[in-house]
């Protein structure tokens, strides 16, 4: 994990919104029949550079969503946003799900599908090109998208790592 993890971020101070990505109904076979349960993947974010995801499991849908939101607030990360897009191209992999994200010019819009779109909307990214490759399992796609966003660094962070100012970073 990088230094941008939830340890530095206080979710209580952020105005977090939530977006439901996927609900799954599970069944446990017992002597009297089937007992159904639900799990929900929820993405939370303030649309200003903070995003997180959570998984909630319960016997009722609303309880599963509420647990997912609480779990998501514990996993919030900071995302670098430059002029409504990401600073550079990134490919992230989680399990067999792979997500490719490319920065886009203003006015392009959010070109993403399914689970990746929910993550990027909650992060506050407006212009981006994405492609989801490999597995389409929403659990792994969400985790790959957040892993990619978390791995990005803006010019200030690169300068700090190299002990250079911004001008020197862009010249090298």
From Swiss-Prot:
GO terms for biological process, alphabetical: translation
S5 DRBM domain ranges (all copies): 16-79
Mitochondrion keyword on record: no
Keywords for the protein's UniProt record, in alphabetical order: Ribonucleoprotein, Ribosomal protein, RNA-binding, rRNA-binding
GO cellular component annotations of the record: small ribosomal subunit
GO molecular function, one term: rRNA binding
Family annotation (InterPro entries): Ribosomal_Su5_D2-typ_SF, Ribosomal_uS5, Ribosomal_uS5_bac-type, Ribosomal_uS5_C, Ribosomal_uS5_N, Ribosomal_uS5_N_CS, Ribsml_uS5_D2-typ_fold_subgr
Similarity section: Belongs to the universal ribosomal protein uS5 family.
Subunit structure comment from the entry: Part of the 30S ribosomal subunit. Contacts proteins S4 and S8.
Domain writeup: The N-terminal domain interacts with the head of the 30S subunit; the C-terminal domain interacts with the body and contacts protein S4. The interaction surface between S4 and S5 is involved in control of translational fidelity.
Protein function: With S4 and S12 plays an important role in translational accuracy.
Protein name (database record): Small ribosomal subunit protein uS5
Lineage of origin: Bacteria, Pseudomonadati, Chlorobiota, Chlorobiia, Chlorobiales
């Amino acid at each position: 994990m990088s230094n941008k993890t939830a340890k530095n971020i206080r979710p209580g101070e952020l105005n977090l919104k939530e977006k439901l990505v996927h609900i799954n109904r599970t069944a446990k076979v017992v002597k009297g029949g089937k007992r159904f349960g639900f799990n929900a993947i929820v993405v939370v974010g303030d649309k200003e550079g903070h995003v997180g995801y959570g998984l909630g499991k319960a016997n009722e849908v609303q309880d599963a969503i509420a647990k997912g939101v609480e779990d998501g607030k514990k996993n919030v990360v900071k995302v670098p946003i430059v002029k409504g897009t990401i600073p550079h191209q990134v490919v992230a992999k989680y399990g067999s799900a792979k997500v490719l994200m490319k920065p886009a010019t203003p006015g392009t819009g959010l070109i993403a599908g399914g689970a990746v779109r929910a993550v990027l909307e909650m992060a506050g990214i407006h212009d981006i090109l994405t492609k989801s490759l490999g597995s389409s399992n929403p659990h792994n796609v969400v985790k790959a998208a957040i892993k990619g966003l978390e791995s990005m660094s803006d010019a200030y962070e690169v300068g700090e790592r190299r002990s250079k100012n911004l001008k020197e970073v862009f010249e090298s």
